[in-house]
Amino acid sequence: MEVLFQNLLNLDWKMVVMWLIGGALIYLAIKKDMEPTLLLPMGFGAILVNLPLSGAVTQGEEEGALSLLYQAGIANELFPLILFIGIGAMIDFGPLLSNPVLMLFGAAAQFGIFFTLCTASMFFDLNDAASIAVIGAADGPTSIVVSQKLHSNYLGAIMVAAYSYMALVPIIQPPIIKLLTTKKERTIHMEYTQRPVSKTTRILFPIVITLIAGLIAPASVSLVGFLMFGNLIRECGVLDSLSETAQKILANLVTIFLGITIASQMQAANFLRLDTLLILFLGLIAFIFDTAGGVLFAKLLNLFLKKKVNPMIGAAGISAFPMSGRVVQKLAMKEDPTNFILMQATGVNVSGQIASVIAGGLILNFFLH
């Protein structure tokens, strides 16, 4: 009987705290329906790796399953890149192609990344600061790739922060939007005219974006390339079954593995540190300033436009697709039930997906030596 319980002697309070954190993630996934495909495996994985002498992670010469998955899928950036194929297959760039000026909002909404880079550099070395700053894009795969390539010492905390803030978009964004806009601005109606987009344009778009991104930020080629490859599968018209597979089976399967593998970096000894709290705080700052950057850019444009834009659409310029666009539409209808700006918000949202990947590539170009 004593043998059965001797492992309890290896238990410490930090592990119990991580169980509670894992339980909180599972609660948010199930009860609040916040990114359940990610938060549930992350939460369960956090419990797995914080059991005393857990066989899920490498102990001495005994290799753990989650450690092997980490080496096979995250250490070489494979899981995030494969996930980008699925995300690309899900995205319809039609609203953006109908109104290309929306790309400007996606670019403006990356302001928080570079603001936080400057702030984080006061507390961390430049590579870690750059990795932390990318949390603001609300783009988990990009955060993982940038952190991994820059050999950040805080990969676990960065991954958890990036995906947690993605899930918390409906909670974080509305107060920021309301703080920066007036009721009159939030009730601005925007006329939407569906301009036809030819099949040729839809096919050429992912190819051209990949070429441009590769010339501007060569380090972003794998990120942009896999995203655009997924979109090309969607739009080419001859790979419908592959497109369906990429959107559903591939994306869901990789997301499950990604979520539980991220948890391998959530061991108590490495996670429960003051540095982690600071990273979570700086990641939140980056997220807030990304949202604010998009809104304030829209307000600036309104100073020069005859037909005003609803500044709330600027907040959709982060990479959290399609949550951010839906949040903006929900706020618009709350102020005025007849105000429908979903298509414009979606166009900005997909432009933010591209802009965040390119921003990540630019950061890699600056700091990867």
Please identify what each model-predicted range represents.
Residues 1-10, 31-32, 44-78, 232-255, ...:
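Hydrophobic transmembrane alpha-helices of multi-pass solute/ion transporters
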Residues 7-18, 67-83, 128-136, 218-228, ...:
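Structural signature of hydrophobic alpha-helical transmembrane segments
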Residues 31-39, 58-59, 66-70, 91-105, ...:
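Interfacial helix-loop-helix linkers and transmembrane-helix boundary segments
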Residues 71-76, 85-90, 104-111, 115, ...:
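Alpha-helical membrane segments and immediately flanking helix-loop junctions
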Residues 153-171, 282-288, 313-314:
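Alpha-helical transmembrane segments
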Residues 164-238:
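Membrane-embedded hairpin module used as a gating/binding unit in multi-pass transport
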